[in-house]
Amino acid sequence: MSYAYLFKYIIIGDTGVGKSCLLLQFTDKRFQPVHDLTIGVEFGARMITIDGKQIKLQIWDTAGQESFRSITRSYYRGAAGALLVYDITRRDTFNHLTTWLEDARQHSNSNMVIMLIGNKSDLEARREVKKEEGEAFAREHGLIFMETSAKTAANVEEAFINTAKEIYQKIQDGVFDINNEANGIKIGPQHSPASQSLNVGGSGGNQGGNCC
Amino acid sequence: MDYFRKVLGAPQDVQTNSGADTVERLCERVSSSTLLDDRRDAVRALKALSKKFRLEVGTQAMDILLNVLEHDRTDAEIIGYALDTFYHIMSNEPTDEDDVSNVYGHDLGGQFTEIFIKHAENVSLLLSFLEEYDFHVRWPTVKLLTVLLTNRQKELQEIILVVPMGVSRLMDLLSDSREIIRNDALLLLNQLTKGHANIQKIVAFENAFERIIDIIRDEGATDGGIVVEDCLLLLQNLLRNNASNQNFFKEGSYIQKLKPFFQIHDEPHSKQIGWSAQKVTNMHLLLQLVRTLVSPNNPQNQTVACQKVMNQCGLLQDLCSILMASGVPADVLTETINTVSEVIRGSQMNQEYFASVLAPSTPPRPAIVVLLMSMVNEKQPFVLRCAVLYCFQSFLYKNEVGQSQIIQTLLPTAADANSITAGQLLCGGLFSADPLSNWFASVALLHAIVENPTQKEQLLRVQLATSLGSPPVSLLQQCCNMLSQGGKLQTRIGLLMILCGWLSDCPIAVSHFLNNTANVPYLISQVSSSEGDEHEAIVQGLCAFLLGICMLYNDDTSEAFSKTALKQIMQNRIGLESFTDKLSQVAQNESYTRAAKKPHLYHKHPSEIVFDYEFTRLFKSLENEVLKAVSGSGSNINGRKSGPSTEQQYKNLLKEQEDQVLLLRQRIEELQSHAISADKSIVELQRQVQQLKDQNALLKAQKGSLSPASSISSDEVDSLKREVESLRLQLHNSHIFSNTVSDENKENDPDGASVLNVTIARLQSELAHKDEEVLSLRSELDRVNEVLKQKTSEQTAASSSVSNAEVELKLQQTEEKLKLITDERNHLQERLTKSNEENLKLANTIRKLEDEKVDAVNEKENLKEEMDTLKKEQDDLLVLLADQDVKIDKYKTKLKELGQEVEDDDDDDDELGEDNEEDLDAD
């Protein structure tokens, strides 16, 4: 499985907003209505294509509970992208975004791409946070925004892929130092500058001298 | 330092006292001195004392030293001393002064560790020292953290986890260019990650897999030293029981990166020397690492995914070649077999590959056969035999095709007298005198038919030729005979397990079993016997289980032992209580629980072998049903007597009976619906059986068609091998040739020079030769001149007397001579020009070799000059000759003028010539 780039993501946000379900929907294309509480972090991976290039996403799904905060903080530094998730049916999860963002900005590298996600868009009837509010928050803090539903899979692909596109663009713009793996980006094995075999330009003409 | 010197000179008991005093005074100096130098000296002295007076230094200096760490961190030296002091008082490692430190009890270091980590800030302080690059700070910090982790692992893990970037900082140590720090960091990370899934995940997130695998590779993989061992231990720490990390490991393509480490170079010299102990350890750990990824205890999808990758990247192939390689130590081989087992277990693709592996023997045999040969061989190490059985089981696990292939080798149709088959080996093992072989073979056979009714029926067809003259006996009957003959515990348990597995879910086998009337009485006698130890109890329990199975899967074809008959016998002869008791003893046995834990046979001693994992599963699933079959619906027995009755009694009875009738009707309805569904399922099952049979036939046909192909391909392989061999030989030859050629090339230049020298020498000699020739030519010319002079004088002298003809003749002769000389000269000239050309050529060669060039050119130029002068001389000579010619012409004309006949005598001519010459002179 060769790839051009490898991006490391983390998923953060309050407990119960659907982080693990988003990951499961993205990696396994299925929805699990009753999901165990995440303990610490769980890992998932998938290959996507951007601009005709294979990109491997390695995703660490973190526990939302406060007690795991110290553990999840360790993952900020090495991540290239973060999905910050709240639940549109629970206002408090939206209110906590500022804390999450501060935490993320403090511990991550400054170039980390953050995607704000309002999850559970299928539960329109129980909506407590308007889409406009999410958009406004994202605009204010320079984030990308999207509403998703891990249950119906609406926008789930897009959320992960758009984040990757943003990172990819930053690489093209030279913002990321791609040789520093601590940024959560790695160049694929076959794309690293390999030593090309040089063609030696002919051995000097050794003819002549036999003209008599 | 004075104090210190005093201490060293003091006797033992005084030493302790004065030691404490010294420590006290040093502590005071550290805390009160305002000068950094003084403090540093005092801390250095404390460090020196800290090994010998751990208790004193630990109790008195801890806070003071912590203070130093906090406030003197600009001075690397004092920090280093303080950290070393901490290390000494925390470390429980035995030192040179072991007797002294032991006085304080065993876990002094642990107690100090507790005090130290009571304030979590102390640990953060230590972690912050890791930012310091100075070796005197970083190294002792790593050592101190390691010893703290060793002493109080759980507590410290929690503290480090909470410190921001704590784990990340420790991970960064792996990139330290100083090897000693990197290596100690490996030990530190090993302690840090032990049993803590969250830290394991963070460490993995920090690219641990990549970095560790890089270190392993840089250190020479399995040929590397203890650092490789530490790396492999760390990898295992990170992966064991950590599904998330395992998934990451697989997704990060790290399995592929492990692959090169498994390539064993089959060098002849390594065969003689053997494997170093370190290499054996490294290989062992590497294999265990693979097993961690495909362990049957992992989540199944995880294991399946890893198995697939291992096949695709060629890791399984490498493992199989280690299996078949020579010179591999027995314990590595055993672990390799275990590893192969778990890589193929339950994975159809990998099992198929394994079945195709051939051992490099003559003729090539399937690896499975070669392995089974070891299994039934008493001389092989016990653990190796266990591993082979595990491998065989894993090969057959969820592998109906494999099962049928094995059973096929037992059937008479497929019998091939020449080659050894798995079936022959299993039968041999089953009836060998070695109880362990009996056990291994029966369990192996059990796995060939487990959960596979078709193969159970096929196995019934197996007939054995016992001895000459007597009729063949079926395998089933032979097993029963052996069982009834007694024998060792493992033999009987093995036989009972295969019989239980065989008869379960297979009514035909049950009826075969019951047809021999000796079997049931034997079982009854075993179960009803009350004597015996723990082991006999197992046998009795298994006999009860077998009896239960005979009831459970009884199709009532045997009249003597129909379901009801059996029940009757059991209840009368054994009793329900006793039967239940015997049956339950099986599961209560310690070896049963041990075997039920995991499929891997992790026995250390042959005596530990009792139960098989697969059998425990069978037992678990059928135990209750057997009990139900034996005890349930036992209420059929009607023991009531009808006594003197009243109307009420009759009414009651009637009501009871009516109720019963109702119940029975319901029961009948239930049973009818059951029967209908059962019929349906029977039809379906029959269809399935038919399908399976068809498939089987198809497979057989395929197999038949495949086998010639495979023989052809083996021929092809042989010829290819031969070709490869010859090519290799050619390669070798050409190699030798190229070597000699290159040698020649090396010597080429000096040779060329010498060749040139020789040519020059030759040229020189040639030139000398030509010089000589020219000289001789010149002398000849002189002579000719003289002769001419003589002639002219003669001519002039005898101008009147000598006849012209003579003169003419002489002239002709001289002309001829001259012609000869000119020819010779021309010839020489030609040679000279040729040599000139040669010289030019050589000049080209000379130019290429700059060393020799100057001399050669100079010489050559000299030669040229010489030659030029010679040419000039020759030219002169030519001119002279021309002059002579002219003169001769003149003489001729003169002679003619004189009227003398040219045809005169030579003498006259001479005289005339002399005369002429004289005349000329006179002119």
UniProtKB/Swiss-Prot annotation, chain A:
PANTHER family: DRAB11-RELATED. SUPFAM superfamilies: P-loop containing nucleoside triphosphate hydrolases. It is a lipid-anchor. One of its GO terms (cellular component) is endoplasmic reticulum-Golgi intermediate compartment membrane. InterPro entries: P-loop_NTPase (IPR027417), Rab_GTPases_membrane_traffic (IPR050209), Small_GTP-bd (IPR005225), Small_GTPase (IPR001806). A lipid is attached at C211, C212 (S-geranylgeranyl cysteine). GO terms for molecular function: GTP binding; GTPase activity. GO terms for biological process: protein transport; vesicle-mediated transport. Required for protein transport from the endoplasmic reticulum to the Golgi complex. It is found in: Endoplasmic reticulum-Golgi intermediate compartment membrane; Endoplasmic reticulum membrane; Golgi apparatus membrane. It comes from the Eukaryota. This is Ras-related protein Rab-2. Keywords: Endoplasmic reticulum, ER-Golgi transport, Golgi apparatus, GTP-binding, Lipoprotein, Membrane, Nucleotide-binding, Prenylation, Protein transport, Transport.
